[in-house]
């Protein structure tokens, strides 16, 4: 059973551990700072934390196993060529600066991938000492079709490294669809065909470049299968992302986070809500939905979750599952942190007083 959780919040990074009496918030780091994301690397026990200091920029910190946190290199964009007109899908100038680190994933030996706003993808082959921008994705002419969704600027929030071949990597962009490389970043192709958005011109609804996937996950046990929580609902692919099909769930198909069972590609969890202007749980009742049959049916899971006057939203990185597929953790915008040790059948509230939670990760 998993024993630790890294919780990234608006006011610091918190470690949560499991003892004899249950789950407890143990230590806090970078208190008062905006910690957008954390990563635990099981290869050597190293932890990474990204901090957004606003005016003072984005920083990346690393903690070797048993050591103190130290600052390491932050992914950095090259200087924008003089005279280059670089506009996003809204027609706004693109700033060539790291404005947020939105995704971190481990890959091959010593390799870490990093997704950022305004849409640059970086790779480190020395565990964060140095970073390389994937120039062929950044310079792709279709990048200028990307636009901001919930944020004002586009960003890469999901990175799926294929367990069969680490040279194959897929990234999801809000809003810019899904992109895949099969040669370790040398070339890239759009892979959001079949997705459909419902908040724009009908003539453009199925354009892959305008899709807004909120979160994408790949099945470790059956890597040709993917799940996406999209702005316009739930989508799945059973053929390596070549084609996506819509899946309907109640009480809502809208949400941000999704996780897939590590040993069963047809089992996945979502946190539904009312979309767009509202972005609150349906009827003020906090629930999780789970499918065990590839999206044909869903079960509403609510034991231990508030069913009246609940206004929690779970962000795209606010839901996580452990490697055994038994324990889930979920953190909300109101500072609630819940853990389930039975695949979501029931939930225990670990804390209701944390700052706004951006992301959770098992460690």
Regions found by a protein language model. Name each.
Residues 1-363:
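Extracellular glycan-interacting surfaces
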């Amino acid at each position: 059973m998993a024993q630790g959780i890294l919780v990234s919040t608006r006011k610091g990074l918190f470690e949560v551990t499991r003892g004899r009496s249950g789950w407890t918030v143990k230590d806090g780091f970078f208190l008062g700072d905006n910690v957008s994301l954390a990563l635990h690397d099981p290869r050597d026990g190293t932890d990474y934390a990204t901090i957004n200091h606003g005016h003072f920029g984005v920083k990346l910190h690393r903690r070797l196993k048993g050591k103190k946190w130290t600052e390491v290199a932050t992914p950095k964009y090259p200087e924008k060529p003089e005279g280059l007109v670089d506009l996003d899908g809204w027609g706004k100038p693109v700033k060539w600066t790291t404005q947020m680190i939105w995704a971190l994933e481990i890959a091959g030996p010593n390799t870490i991938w990093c997704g950022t706003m305004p849409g640059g993808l970086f790779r480190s082959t020395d565990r964060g000492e140095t970073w390389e921008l994937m120039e062929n994705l950044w310079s792709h002419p279709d990048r200028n079709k990307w636009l901001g969704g919930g944020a004002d600027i586009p960003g890469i929030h999901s990175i799926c490294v294929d367990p069969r071949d680490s040279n194959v990597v897929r990234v999801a962009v809000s809003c810019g669809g899904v992109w895949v490389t099969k040669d370790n970043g040398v070339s890239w192709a759009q892979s959001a065909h079949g997705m459909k958005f419902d908040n724009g011109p009908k003539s453009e609804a199925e354009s892959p470049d305008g899709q807004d996937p909120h979160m994408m996950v790949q099945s470790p046990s059956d890597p040709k299968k993917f799940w996406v929580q999209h702005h316009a609902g739930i989508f799945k692919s059973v053929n390596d992302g070549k084609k996506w099909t819509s899946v309907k769930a109640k009480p809502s198909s809208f949400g941000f986070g999704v996780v897939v069972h590590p040993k069963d590609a047809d089992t996945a969890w979502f946190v539904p809500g009312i979309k767009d202007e509202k972005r609150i749980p349906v009827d003020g009742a906090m629930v999780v939905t789970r499918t065990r049959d590839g999206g044909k049916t869903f079960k509403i899971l609510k034991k231990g979750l508030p069913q009246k006057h609940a206004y929690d939203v779970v962000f795209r990185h606010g839901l996580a599952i452990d490697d055994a597929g038994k324990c889930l953790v979920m953190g909300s915008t109101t500072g609630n942190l819940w853990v389930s040790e039975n695949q979501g059948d029931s939930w225990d509230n670990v804390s209701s007083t944390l700052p706004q939670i951006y992301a959770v990760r098992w460690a």
